[in-house]
């Protein structure tokens, strides 16, 4: 996953990237539609 992520025009580069990744992963695992956030779900099983 790229470390530089832009959400709502805000640059989140290097701002707790592990937390962002974890949030995306958890969101995917419980079925949250992450397409609205611009993230892509990757299966990590």
From Swiss-Prot:
InterPro entries: Corona_NS4. It comes from the Viruses. Belongs to the coronaviruses ns4/ns4.8 protein family. This is Non-structural protein of 4.8 kDa. It comes from Bovine coronavirus (strain Mebus) (BCoV).
């Amino acid at each position: 996953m790229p470390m530089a992520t832009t959400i709502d025009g805000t640059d989140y580069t290097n701002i707790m990237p592990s937390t962002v990744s974890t949030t995306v992963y958890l969101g995917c695992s419980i079925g949250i539609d992450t397409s609205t956030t611009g993230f892509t779900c990757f299966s990590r099983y």
